[in-house]
Amino acid sequence: MREYKRYWLALVAVMVVCFSILGYYGVEVYRNSPPVVNFTDENGKVVIDKESIYKGQEAWQSIGGMQVGSVWGHGAYQAPDWSADWLHKELVAFLEIKADEIYHLKYADLNAEQKANLKVLLKKEYRENSVKDDKFVLSADRLKAISQVASEYAALFGDDPKFKSLREAYAMKENTLPNASDRADLNNFFFWSAWATATNRPGSEATYTNNWPHEPLIDNVPTGENVFWSIASVVILLAGIGLLVWFSSFYGKKDDEKLEPISEDPLKKLNLTPSQKALKKYLFVTLALFAFQILIGGFTAHYTVEGQEFYGINLSAYIPYSLARTWHIQASIFWIATGFLAAGLFLAPIINGGKDPKFQKLGVDLLFYALLFLVVGSFVGEYLAIANIMPINLSFWLGHQGYEYIDLGRVWQIILFVGLVIWMLLLLRGFAGGFKNKGDKNLLAIFAMSAVAVGLFYGAGLFYGQRSPLPVMEYWRWWVVHLWVEGFFEVFATASLAFVFVSLGLVSKRFATFQTLASASLFMIGGIPGTFHHLYFAGTTTPIMAIGASFSALEVVPLVLLGAEAYEHYRLQFAQSWAKTLKWPLYCFIAVAFWNMLGAGVFGFLINPPISLFYIQGLNTTPVHAHAALFGVYGFLALGFVWLVATYLFKGQEFDENLMKVGFWGLNAGLMLMIVLSLLPIGIYQAFASLEQGMWYARSAELLQQSHLQNLRWLRMLGDTILIIGGICFFAQLLKFMFNKKA
């Protein structure tokens, strides 16, 4: 322990300080959320009450929420951002009403001076905050404007034939929300979300969403703080890179211990335990869900060009875009998590001296069947909610929460959390035997801690409720999406790989321990407070922006050395004479390093500075980062774990080189083509539109249905097809292992 004392102290200090920051400013998120108030007319009559806004939030959740457009920039990209769209339409309606009232002309027919006068009135009407006694007074003209937008939205979310082509452009099914009273509540929720984007915080010149979205009509432009912290984030990034290169050059640990030649793979000498043999079905489910996810992903992408049809067949009444996208995202979380679960459960008996703890196989089997129940149950619940079969009051619990990546109903979410805790306990039972052994146990300690973090921190997603304010929900949602996945999964992967490579005699334990402890500190110092970079415009204050921009810049710092990490993984296959049998798992880990650098590093920083995200939040630049980071990093990690475990579960069998080459390179090439041929150019085009005209236009059908953007979406099919072929080849390889007589 003494040898690693500085590293442990650094890790503990990082965790304490960073979680203190995250917790302290989390309290600020609660305190400073935009208020849900009663809206009255000038006579004091309540025209939009708080209860109807909350009911509207529930109705929005039940139809898929963030899977049907977005609110405050978070959600899907085909339909509009409803808060930006509502705001712009209401502003335009208000200007027309005032132009007619004052000048008896249409707004377009006014001269420059008249337009300027109306814009002064508009900004005063919308930016001033007059909340008093939990009430906000709406003028008669503003109520007329609200009524016009509400009528349009009610028709859009119903089945009015005049809006059919627009529903197709937005990839919305007919009668998205059939009940008229529910649509009225939904309108009130969308109005409130737009109101928060236009209304200044008390004592501030910025709105509740830090002036997002960009809307020139009321001077919703970046604040001075936005620009300052954007510049600061770049400076912090450069300083961090310089310090990292300096310290890694002068003080970085090198693996200078000479490895003892080993004639045979040490793990292949071990007899598989019953619990390890039971993991074959985990590998099957991992790749089966992966195959399903990429197929439904291609299906979902096709909706962006045909809206309600799949090559002329109208499937939107059965599997609409919102449901297909929900399943696509939910399946990705399930299969990646299952791959990680399998890796941990495989290593537990090895750590325990090559034997199962008591009833370990029973625990592994029960966990597997609970996983199947969870997947099927949550998918059915999401279908019933979006199909409007499940009552809205049950949807949050059994159907669809409406929040991206945590779409599954709360009951299913609790089952998933319980399953992760059971997995954690199964691992710790195996780790307990390892702690009884003599020798250096520092690597095992960090491995165990990462397993506990993976098991417990998903529970953060249970801390918000059905009616929680959106900023509060976003705070806890990103604890799961950012901190649980991007933080603790990363540490768990690093620790588990280090343990495997040490067990195989490919690296020294001392070097692996130093590297794992140092990596954990680097991941966490930026990753924990960096969670706030998702909340710049989610109804939070300037300190949240400052913390998020500063610390999330540090997340990119360790990624600059990933070229060296990729080389180290490549070199491992030559470390021992037999190590070439690990070629394909190692290639997957090389891919992880590449996509971590590009997807998390380059594409991640593209949307990281506040000034950048102000204009491109919710555009197609976001799925560029999401696909490259989630699949490119964590997907390939899970696939690497699958092939690593499969190497030992299917002893005596060899990889089919043709299947694996097509699979590996197909997945990488397909992902790259999807990004460079379609998502990235569309995102860049939208960014210019957002800069010049506003967020509403960048997300509008008017822009996205232009022929050249349609062609770019069709081009995505090339990358999608190659990626799907690669995924099917990987699945075929596993089936070949499983049904080979030698198995």
PLM features per residue range, with description:
Residues 253-279, 355-358, 572-582:
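Membrane-interfacial, low-structure loops and terminal tails that flank and connect transmembrane helices
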Residues 91, 256-269, 442-445, 695-698:
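Juxtamembrane inter-helical linkers in multi-pass membrane proteins
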Residues 1-49:
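Post-cleavage N-terminal segment of exported redox proteins
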Residues 8-28, 60, 68, 203, ...:
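Hydrophobic cores of alpha-helical transmembrane segments in multi-pass integral membrane proteins
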Residues 1-7, 219-224, 268-279, 404-405, ...:
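Short, Lys/Arg-rich N-terminal segment immediately upstream of the first membrane anchor
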Residues 31-227:
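Soluble extramembrane regions of membrane proteins in the secretory/endomembrane system
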Residues 401-410, 439, 472-482, 540-551, ...:
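Non-cytosolic membrane-interface motifs at loop->transmembrane helix junctions
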Residues 41-44, 309-323, 615-618:
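Perimembrane loop-to-helix junctions flanking transmembrane segments
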